[in-house]
A protein has these predicted regions:
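Beta-strand-rich modules
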Residues: 155-176
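Solvent-exposed loop segments of extracellular immunoglobulin-like
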Residues: 26-33, 109, 123-127
Length: 200
């Protein structure tokens, strides 16, 4: 082995090719591990032998291809392990649900969620929160904020008595996730106890 490869960053869906120079006499045999688990010969990671290098290929990279690899290269003289770290660059996964709705009033509601399980190789920069008045149609999503930094947000300016759905999207420098949606719509209204208070 002439050198150790650095961390490889590859965009989701692209093909990763890593050329690793070697010195010695073939033929060589290869065994691949990912995160300390042996991968079968028929797995997605392909290792090809050339005169003075080996070529590691992962086609159509998926999120699950990210991780730490170890490639054991062996010939009649001995063996060595080549470490290879793969980072998949992609938009984050959706925020982790459920999307909880609390503190519902006649003109507001508070949303809470958890961060995505996969940030796509880059830090989550924030969240986009959207609302939909169900009386306006299935595509009437309106952004409430495009720069929420926390995993909770109080949606303002709801209309008393109207029914709403909500959704939250995560974003990073690579793009925007699919949305996490509320499981069912809620009606903006005063809680029953507050209505009784105002009647008295």
């Amino acid at each position: 082995l002439s050198r150790e490869p650095e961390e490889q960053r590859v965009t989701l869906g692209d093909t990763l090719k890593v050329k690793i120079p070697i010195s010695g006499k073939g033929p060589y045999s290869f065994k691949v591990k990912k995160d300390d688990q042996s991968l079968p010969d028929s797995d997605r990671v392909r290792v090809q032998e050339f005169d003075d290098y080996i070529l590691v290929t992962i086609p159509d990279v998926e999120r699950d291809d990210a991780g730490k690899y170890s490639i054991n290269v062996a010939n009649d003289s001995g063996s060595c392990n080549v470490p290879l770290k793969v980072k998949v660059i992609a938009p984050p996964l959706p925020p982790t649900g459920p999307l909880e709705i609390s503190n519902v009033g006649k003109d507001h509601a508070t949303l809470s969620w958890k961060p995505p399980k996969d940030d796509g190789g880059s830090r989550v920069a924030g969240y986009i929160v959207e609302r939909r008045d169900t009386s306006k149609g299935p595509d009437a999503w309106i952004p409430v904020t495009q720069a929420c930094k926390e995993t909770t947000f109080t949606v303002p300016s709801l209309l008393d008595g109207h029914e709403y759905e909500f959704r939250v999207l995560a974003f990073n420098e690579n793009g925007t996730s699919e949305p996490l949606r509320s499981s069912s719509p809620v009606v903006a209204k005063l809680p029953f106890s507050m209505k009784e208070k105002y009647r008295k």
